[in-house]
Amino acid sequence: MGAPSALPLLLLLACSWAPGGANLSQDDSQPWTSDETVVAGGTVVLKCQVKDHEDSSLQWSNPAQQTLYFGEKRALRDNRIQLVSSTPHELSISISNVALADEGEYTCSIFTMPVRTAKSLVTVLGIPQKPIITGYKSSLREKETATLNCQSSGSKPAAQLTWRKGDQELHGDQTRIQEDPNGKTFTVSSSVSFQVTREDDGANIVCSVNHESLKGADRSTSQRIEVLYTPTAMIRPEPAHPREGQKLLLHCEGRGNPVPQQYVWVKEGSEPPLKMTQESALIFPFLNKSDSGTYGCTATSNMGSYTAYFTLNVNDPSPVPSSSSTYHAIIGGIVAFIVFLLLILLIFLGHYLIRHKGTYLTHEAKGSDDAPDADTAIINAEGGQSGGDDKKEYFI
């Protein structure tokens, strides 16, 4: 019976303490802050707020418990620390040119009864240095293995390293991490190995460092590599379709690293070699049918040799007229057209003269010594148009 009688008493005590408990959970005099992250060399703002200051001032102190500001009054002589805002409900300060040593817990206090505090954890990011690539000493031969090392110091937290060749990602080994002597930052390193090909000649191998302090900015170093490889060659004719009587150049286009320094021309079935020179062209000043055949060009460097072949077929002389023949044809066409026009004019002129021959002779007769007789002839001729069948005599 004793236990049930004690239950109402416990409930009564709980109800009597409830308001006090609610006040403690909603303490208007409790200040609040927030954690901050800043890059080394940057500026951080510490903000402390309180709802009920109880006629007391707010105070900021550093991890060493040195007072920085008490209200609007500076307490520590450090020009990097400046007052941003000071009101009964807020105290904000800024720290510029932040160093790694500034990292830690900063305390905001209000001197009420009891004293209330709030913590702000300041994290300082160490910026990684530009990476350094080592391991490349001299040019590599095709199919040899290249091994490069990359290293970057000063990052906090430790950075990550990545490799690429042009736009192609290279898979290096896992990033190695080593703590720097200051005990705060880290040195990271990575290596990459790959077999080189002739396509890698002149390629840039890039090592990049990735870190949150860079905020997406690129921080990388590149190493250009040189690859030595055997030459290749191809023969290009100029003109592309040679004909008998033309001038022909056969260009032997050699490629390689190093570039071929010697070219030897041969024709199948003929001895000795046609030409041995440092220049790559074989010249035919005047092509003949006998020049047809298969020609070989051997390009040589200190990495080796390569022979390219070309079959030459000399075609018959071009039926296409030369420029001078074309010019003469144009002149001949113009002359023929002019002659044709003159003939047309002569035909029309002859036809005109035939139709007007009588009139021409009559006028000519008027100018002679027998002009009276001529007039008589003209009159008689005119009268003859109405005289029927009478016989008329004319004097011309």
Swiss-Prot record:
Positions annotated with a glycan in the UniProt record: N288
Signal peptide: 1-22
Membrane-traversing stretches: 329-349
Topology, Extracellular side: 23-328
Domain called Ig-like C2-type: residue spans: 128-226, 231-313
Subcellular location(s) per record: Cell membrane; Cell junction
Residue ranges occupied by any Ig-like V-type domain in the UniProt entry: 23-124
GO molecular function, a single term: protein homodimerization activity
Free-text note on domains in this protein's UniProt record: The cytoplasmic region mediates interaction with EPB41L1, DLG3, PALS2 and CASK.
Function: Involved in cell-cell adhesion. Has both calcium-independent homophilic cell-cell adhesion activity and calcium-independent heterophilic cell-cell adhesion activity with IGSF4, NECTIN1 and NECTIN3. Interaction with EPB41L1 may regulate structure or function of cell-cell junctions.
Family under the similarity heading: Belongs to the nectin family.
Subunit composition and interactions: Homodimer. Can form trans-heterodimers with NECTIN3. Interacts with EPB41L1, DLG3, PALS2 and CASK.
Annotated protein name in UniProt: Cell adhesion molecule 3
Source species of the chain: Mus musculus
